[in-house]
Amino acid sequence: MMIICSDNIATNMIIDYLGLDTINACIRELGFGHTVLHNPLHFDRYDKLGTTTPRDYAALFAQVAKGTLVSKEASAAMLGIFRQQHYNTMLTHDFPQFYLDCEETGEPELIWVASKSGSMNACRNDGGIIHTPYGEYVIVLMNKEFHDIIEYNDPPAMVYGARVSRMILDQILACEGKLYLK
């Protein structure tokens, strides 16, 4: 529930059960040195809920994709959960639907996404693994100072993120997955 539906009640139940210190120790042990959970997810009570960086977020998804986060089995289970996540609009909104939706044909999806989004106050974030016919890549989009109302269609942060995500996908597909940075 806490990943697929972004249910903060489920998240807070885990926080209450394990405790912030235990969770933060695990985060550090996994190597995410710039990520901290400051408080339970009560938006009306706390100004600072958590801190992370694009690098830590990308490293998390890279390890899940490689099967090296905790174990191969745990990574595979996490990947399955991230693939079911409901709120991936920032990553997929501008993707051609014929890549993502093969329910009518019964064929496997050409592109699938395993991601986790989040928003708080003026921050809009999404990150995950994009699987293409040419391989997988990790993308993380973190926006701040977007004082839009996310309840309406196409808020600016989502539109901006979707455009960036589509530009990256187009380059991956055009180069058949062979992108080289010099």
Question: Predicted regions: what is each one?
Answer:
Residues 8, 47, 151-154:
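Active-site oxyanion-binding pockets that recognize sulfate/phosphate
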Residues 6-7, 19:
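Membrane-embedded alpha-helical core segments of multi-pass
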Residues 6, 41, 143-145:
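Short, histidine-centered active-site or binding-site loop motifs used for metal coordination
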Residues 12-69, 73:
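Mid-domain, small-residue-enriched loop/turn segments at the edges of structured enzyme/sensor domains
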Residues 60-99, 106-110, 117-182:
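Structured C-terminal helix/loop/strand segments within mature extracytoplasmic catalytic/sensor domains
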Residues 9-10, 34-38, 87-92:
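Secretory-pathway/luminal and periplasmic proteins that interact with or process carbohydrate-rich
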